Amino acid sequence: MKNIEKLEQSLTYEFKDKNLLIHALTHKSFKKSYNNERLEFLGDAVLDLVVGEYLFHKFTKDAEGDLSKLRAALVNEKSFAKIANSLNLGDFIFMSVAEENNGGKEKPSILSDALEAIIGAIHLEAGFEFAKTIALRLMEKNFPQIDAKILIKDYKTKLQEITQGKIGQTPQYETVRAFGPDHLKQFEIALMLDGKELARAIAGSKKEAQQMAAKIALEKLGSLQ
């Protein structure tokens, strides 16, 4: 049995039903008939509402579109995996030996899902307000400065607006290569403009690499802004 008391201390919440916490920590590779997918589904809905309400009250002058972008920047696999790592959540997840040997304890998707499942479990046992309090504490601890300008890093859209407006061209993103093991896959993206390479970036997802390449391109095209 894993020392889940340490996890409870980090969460600042002690489960009355320990089996519920174990359920939230059980990956489908460990036991297909008893895993955390349903709790993950619930936790995802809870977190979506918690963060949405938080942003609604924090950014009182922002339009719906900006609030949606802010929520998307916080409610995602990367952000949840960061929070999960702050809890050392990988140490507590039950998974098959094969999955563990494949780097399962470091996979952002597994960590993110487990965090959502835990929030779902807290909601089931203690109610929405308890889940909300814990979720916000974890969010603010890992993202102490929730700034709209920092979070909404949609460099691709900004670059496209500039290039279309100034030179009538739309940037193209080409995958140069994908490399590394499955759980640490990296993607190299080349940003092409008018048939010429303008920037190149490497990241853990195509989307992130494209955003990084767009940011580099924006810096190069600073005179167009």
UniProtKB/Swiss-Prot annotation:
This is Ribonuclease 3. The keyword Nucleotide-binding does not apply. GO terms for cellular component: cytoplasm. Residues 154-223 form the DRBM domain. Digests double-stranded RNA. Involved in the processing of primary rRNA transcript to yield the immediate precursors to the large and small rRNAs (23S and 16S). Processes some mRNAs, and tRNAs when they are encoded in the rRNA operon. Processes pre-crRNA and tracrRNA of type II CRISPR loci if present in the organism. GO terms for molecular function: double-stranded RNA binding; metal ion binding; ribonuclease III activity; rRNA binding. CDD domains: DSRM_RNAse_III_family, RIBOc. Its main location: cytoplasm. It is an enzyme of class 3 (hydrolase). The keyword rRNA-binding applies. GO terms for biological process: mRNA processing; regulation of gene expression; rRNA processing; tRNA processing. Keywords: Cytoplasm, Endonuclease, Hydrolase, Magnesium, Metal-binding, mRNA processing, Nuclease, RNA-binding, rRNA processing, rRNA-binding, tRNA processing. It holds the Pfam family dsrm. It is found in: Cytoplasm. Residues 4-127 form the RNase III domain. It comes from Campylobacter jejuni subsp. doylei (strain ATCC BAA-1458 / RM4099 / 269.97). It catalyses: Endonucleolytic cleavage to 5'-phosphomonoester.
